[in-house]
Every structure is written in structure tokens, then in C-alpha cells.
A protein has these predicted regions:
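Flexible, charged surface loops at secondary-structure boundaries
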Residues: 41-45, 66, 96-99
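Active-site rim helix/loop that mediates acceptor-substrate recognition in acyltransferases
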Residues: 26-54
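Conserved active-site alpha-helix within GNAT-family acetyltransferase domains
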Residues: 97-126
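Conserved acetyl-CoA binding element of GNAT-fold acetyltransferases
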Residues: 68-79
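Short amphipathic alpha-helix that is part of the acyltransferase structural core
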Residues: 1-34
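Conserved acetyl-CoA-binding loop-helix of GNAT-fold acetyltransferases
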Residues: 77-97
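Glycine-rich phosphate/pyrophosphate-binding loop shared by adenosine-nucleotide-utilizing enzymes
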Residues: 55-63, 70
Length: 126
């Protein structure tokens, strides 16, 4: 499992940057503050990833289905599904099995709040 920035994913960084640029109307920045706040949550090794900001709002989710981590399929998380719990429910309803997988979060304000919810199997990266 990994927690990293979008640009550190081999083969997927450009795809993700283009996608997020479209989401923000063509605006993509690389400031130090944004690198800290844009977190990549790994829901499982190499297959499902969710991009969220520092407040826990899920912005984008996609599936990487090959060993090179190319993002060959994705599931856009609409505004009404921009909370992490709802995104997990959305991915599960799409047929992605998350029952045996651990959600890895960096210890931010968002992860502390989410970890307090019942029903989540969380391992903090410290």
C-alpha cells in the first residue's frame, strides 16, 4: 500500500494531472502547500486509488489494473460523493471488493476524523 503524491506514480502522473486539470477548469499548480494538502489514499495495492484534499474531501477516484500502475480505468467521484465514506460506498457498489483491504491514511486532521468512524479498518502511516 502506498500514500504518495500523484506525480510519484509511474505511468499515471500525466493522466492524473490532466484529469485534475480538467476538474479545476484547466488549473493545475505545484506549490509546496498543495503538495502537502493533496493526498493520495491507497485503498488497496495497485488497484484502487482515491485522491483527496487535506479536509478529507474526495476529488477523484480511479482504478489502476496493471503492474505498471497505469491508470487505465477510473471512476469520477461527483460532488455529492466527495466524502471518503461515500466514495468507498460508491466504489463498492461498482463491484470493487474492499472488505479485506485496509485504508491507509497520512495522520492529518482528516484521517483522525475519519478514523473515529466505526466500520473502517484504518492503518496510519507515521
Amino acid at each position: 500500500m502506498i500514500v504518495c503524491s500523484p506525480e510519484s506514480l509511474p505511468g499515471a502522473g500525466a493522466f492524473i494531472r490532466r484529469s485534475i486539470s480538467r476538474y479545476h477548469g484547466g488549473h493545475w499548480t505545484q506549490t509546496a502547500r498543495e503538495r502537502r494538502e493533496w493526498l493520495l489514499y491507497a485503498l488497496s495495492p495497485l488497484d484502487v486509488y482515491v485522491l483527496a484534499d487535506d479536509d478529507g474531501a474526495v476529488l477523484y477516484a480511479w482504478c489502476a489494473v496493471d503492474a505498471s500502475r497505469n491508470a487505465v480505468g477510473y471512476c469520477y467521484v461527483r460532488a455529492e460523493y466527495r466524502r471518503l465514506g461515500l466514495a468507498v460506498a460508491l466504489l463498492t457498489s461498482a463491484g470493487i471488493d474492499l472488505t479485506r483491504k485496509t485504508l491507509v491514511l497520512e495522520p492529518t486532521r482528516a484521517s483522525v476524523a475519519i478514523a473515529a468512524r466505526p466500520g473502517y479498518n484504518l492503518a496510519h502511516v507515521v
